[in-house]
Amino acid sequence: MKSIVFVALFGLALLAVVCSASEDAHKELLKEVVRAMVVDKTDAVQAEERECRWYLGGCSQDGDCCKHLQCHSNYEWCVWDGTFSK
C-alpha cells in the first residue's frame, strides 16, 4: 500500500516537472517569435529609408532633400520648392 502511494506521488511529481519544462519551452518559443517579428519590422523600416530628407528634415544643401524640396537657408530643413511635376 505504501509503495503504491509512493509511486503515485512520484508519478505526479514527474508529471509536474515535465509540464513545467514544456511550459518554459513554450514561453521561450513565444519570446523567439516576438523577437523575430520585432527584428523583421525594424528591417522593413530600414529598407524603406531613403537617402534624401523628407519635409522638415535637417539638411545642409538642396541635394540632401527629396524631390520637390529644397534646403531652407536659415533653418537648415527641407521645405517645398514650389514645383508640382511628377
UniProtKB/Swiss-Prot annotation:
Record-level GO cellular component terms: extracellular region
Record keywords: Calcium channel impairing toxin, Disulfide bond, Ion channel impairing toxin, Knottin, Neurotoxin, Secreted, Signal, Toxin, Voltage-gated calcium channel impairing toxin
S-S bonds: C52-C66, C59-C71, C65-C78
An annotated Gene Ontology molecular function: ion channel inhibitor activity
Tissue specificity: Expressed by the venom gland.
The keyword Secreted is annotated on this UniProt entry: yes
Signal peptide start-end: 1-20
Name listed for the protein in its UniProt record: Omega-theraphotoxin-Hs2a
Organism: Cyriopagopus schmidti
